[in-house]
Structure formats: C-alpha cells, structure tokens
Amino acid sequence: MTYLHNMKTEWVRKHINDLVSEGLKQMSNPALDDNMFKIWLDYSKQVLEISTKHYNAAILLNYLRPIMSIDSQLPPTQKVGICLDYLIGVLRII
C-alpha cells in the first residue's frame, strides 16, 4: 500500500471513530429523542460523505441501506445502535 492510501485510511478511521464516539454519547443521553437522532444521523451522513468520497464511496452507499430501513417505531437508542453497528463493522475492515 502506498503512503497516500495509508493516510486516507487513517483519515477515514479517525472520522468514523469520532462518529462512533458521538453516537455512544447520544445513546447514553437520557433525553435522546427522535429529533436528536435525526440530527445525529444527518451529521453522520455528512461526515461519511466528506471523509470517504476519495477513499471508498461505497462506505456511504452501504450505510444508507440499513438506515433507510430503520423502523420508525424503534426507540432512538436502538436507531443509533443500528447505525453504530455498521460504523463499527467498517472500522473492522479498513
């Protein structure tokens, strides 16, 4: 692997790690509601779009699949958990 590829990988890892940390904070917030979840979800999509577009755009596309099928009746903590499962899975393979 090239130095540039390694730098891109580290860049993506850092931002996904930050998303996971923010998501865990949201899950531990007893006031978490659907509006807060939607704000975090939009934020996570924007971060993934910016950080992965020159590395592997499929990361964002694959993220959109499970989040589009999240049952709206689930509690916000479960919704964040579904997103975190995907993000943690990405961290394991990059």
Tell me the role of every PLM-derived stretch.
Residues T2-I94:
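Charged interaction/catalytic cores of defense and host-pathogen modules
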